[in-house]
Amino acid sequence: MKISTKGRYALRLMLDLAINHTGSYIPLKTVAQRQNISDKYLEQIIHQLSKAGFVQSARGAQGGYRLTRTPDEYTVGEILRTVEGSLAPVSCLDCKTPCDQFDSCITIGLYKKIQQAIDGVVDHTTLHDMISDYRAKHPKTENI
């Protein structure tokens, strides 16, 4: 499994909204500037996150985006799967119809263990966890 640029940027976008989570709407251009990411690229990502119900939008002068839940209610896994799709290390773990060799495959056990390890990390790590870990290591940093 390799996390794409889209996945990394989605995490950074959600972390930025989480860090600045006051209930107010944050313009996407502000996030783009803070994260040094193209606002056009973030528009594509925010659309997926909005469609999934992770963020709420408002138009107008005071418009922008905000989280629909608290940072401790979002896991890295659900964010990545929303923009990346499956996090399986090999395609045969995703298939609804496994390949002919699935039952006798010598490597499938390893791939399943890798999948479990990935899921164990991303499904048990929240935005809040990531922010807390970062701040513990960088106490003088206000924004990430």
Question: Regions from the language model: what does each represent?
Answer:
Residues 10-22:
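Short amphipathic alpha-helical interface segments
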Residues 26-36:
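A short alpha-helical element within helix-turn-helix/winged-helix DNA-binding domains
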Residues 33, 50-51:
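Alpha-helical residues within the helix-turn-helix
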Residues 40:
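Key DNA-contact positions within bacterial/archaeal DNA-binding proteins
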Residues 46-47:
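Short, hydrophobic-biased segments on the C-terminal half of alpha helices
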Residues 54-67:
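Beta-hairpin "wing" of winged helix-turn-helix
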Residues 71-95, 107, 111-116:
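Conserved segment of winged-helix/HTH DNA-binding domains
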Residues 95-144:
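C-terminal regulatory/oligomerization modules of transcriptional regulators
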